[in-house]
Amino acid sequence: MAILSDRWIREAARTQGMIEPFVEAQRRDGCISYGLSSYGYDARVAPEFKIFTNVDSTIVDPKDFDPKNFVDRETDVCIIPPNSFALARTVEYFRIPRDVLVICLGKSTYARCGIIVNVTPLEPGWEGHVTLEFSNTTPLPARIYANEGACQFLFLQGNEPCETSYADRAGKYMGQKGVTLPKL
């Protein structure tokens, strides 16, 4: 697998709509950086958040997830409570080519503050807004800034197109829009 360059990412965004909206140059003045980088794309977090709450003392169960475990917030600055968790989504909508796998890494600006972002790989043929998982590992409240960089996506090209893509097997998160909760 080869990691794909800024030239390839730009061309795929222009000709295949791989990333929409697409920011051609990295923006970093007065904000957490986002946009095209040398070998990746720094995506922004949208102002739509679901913050874990324990008001009803429920149990988190991925097979029977209760949406009441979250408080919804639309805001430019999301405050995640100490040792807590929030879901969000990217501003960008992604369409992944059949011969590409995308992995995500957190931004060092957030990681150095104890805020970890997690995203599972974007599989060949998948498309949608990416649901972002933010963990505040600190004993203090933490801020996440909407419309600024949240994570970096790295694009890996396989040696040939896959036999069965995410779209072919009708994956459960195909075409997701907004913050998407766990599905079984």
From Swiss-Prot:
UniProt pathway: Pyrimidine metabolism; dUMP biosynthesis; dUMP from dCTP (dUTP route): step 1/2
The organism of origin for this protein: Sphingopyxis alaskensis (strain DSM 13593 / LMG 18877 / RB2256) (Sphingomonas alaskensis)
Known catalytic reactions: dCTP + H2O + H(+) = dUTP + NH4(+)
Keywords: Hydrolase, Nucleotide metabolism, Nucleotide-binding
SUPFAM superfamilies named among the record's database cross-references: dUTPase-like
Protein name: dCTP deaminase
Active site: 133
Residue sites binding dCTP per the record: 107-112, 131-133, 152, 166, 176
EC number, as in UniProt: 3.5.4.13
